[in-house]
UniProtKB/Swiss-Prot annotation:
Motif segment (Nudix box): 38-59
Cofactor: a divalent metal cation
First and last residue of the signal peptide: none
Keywords linked to the UniProt accession: Hydrolase
HAMAP family linked: Nudix_RppH
Protein's recorded name: RNA pyrophosphohydrolase
Superkingdom of the organism of origin: Bacteria
Hydrolase is among the record's keywords: yes
Protein's UniProt keywords contain Hydrolase: yes
Similarity comment: Belongs to the Nudix hydrolase family. RppH subfamily.
Length: 175
């Protein structure tokens, strides 16, 4: 499903743990990394597509996560000309995305990138919140920067709380 401007409706998923780190996934058989994402099927809402993609790409279900936020607006990126499939109609020149910030509510061991018969990813790791902005392919970088800036207001307090839990409390000596 491509809109009149040539953009494919899509959802992007940022999964964070209790420390405010985000799940960074390696594309199957490649050296490139990204957040899980995928197309919205006809008749499907963005939230329904997000849960479907979450299961297909990461092996998690609705009970394994909690929605913390979603982007206010659709965000777009254009594909480099070398990646556009000019022989298909309608021609898709890029993606327009609704992004979701999810908190992982289950164990890391429940993440299963191999649940689908055609996996999108073959590995993953937790990375610092801003790491993906510097590491994603260049044509997605502006969208990632905007997504992370919007989600930072939700994740930064989580990181501060995690740091406080890790900092030992010092008691004053009585003399």
């Amino acid at each position: 499903m491509i809109d009149d401007d040539g953009y494919r409706p899509n959802v992007g998923i940022v999964i964070c743990n209790r420390q405010g780190q985000v799940l960074w996934a390696r594309r199957y058989g490649q050296h490139s990394w990204q957040f899980p994402q995928g197309g919205i099927n006809p008749g499907e809402t963005a939230e329904q597509a997000m849960y479907r993609e979450l299961f297909e790409e990461v092996g998690l279900s609705k009970k394994d996560v909690r929605i913390l936020a979603s982007t206010r607006n659709w965000l777009r990126y254009k594909l480099p000309k070398r990646l556009v499939r000019w022989d298909t109609k309608p021609v898709c020149i890029g993606q327009k995305q609704k992004w979701f910030l999810l908190q992982l509510m289950c164990n890391d061991a429940d993440i299963n990138m191999q649940r689908s018969s055609t996996p999108e990813f073959d590995g993953w790791r937790w990375v610092s919140f801003w790491y993906p902005v510097r590491q994603v392919v260049s044509f997605k970088r502006d969208v990632y920067r905007r997504v992370m800036k919007e989600f930072a207001v939700t994740v930064m307090p989580m990181q501060e709380q995690a740091a406080q839990r890790q900092t030992p409390a010092y008691r004053r000596k009585r003399g």
